[in-house]
């Protein structure tokens, strides 16, 4: 598999107690963890930006994470959808790994979530659609409760991911990522057209947080983070 780039629109929608919707354009890489592209300054993929030991490889760390949960891919292919480190910076609210067995069948999906406090948490899904309890503090306006409904089909020519949080009080939050793969000829043009894309993701999320705070939404204190085995 060659690395691919998807030009995407990312949407966030909060229903209550304050309604807030925002969208922004960006791009994401889909890469094979055994054949990571190296484009200095414009695209770097480092283990320290993802789950596990920063001294190992991303692939080795993912295999270790899965082994700790009784899963052995037998050397099967793993593809990762993520922002690359660009000009020394990266922020990935969500990184998705599609984990295949040696025969090519899908064994599981891993959804790695990062917050703006440099913490991470990985959710192991049995397939591309699953429901899991929320176990990680992400937004300062939501407690750690509720359940995520994730739909994370592996991309082909198009990309369509969605995550919905349903909370006990009936309030919900939804995020989606939709886009299309760009041609190999347009790959570098896409990167150059969005040189600060990954930094802009972090800035937009923080700015929306400031807006919600100024509108009177109360901040939920951040609980002590309990690192997962093989993640942080």
Model regions and ranges:
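Mature, function-bearing regions of proteins
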Residues: 1-232
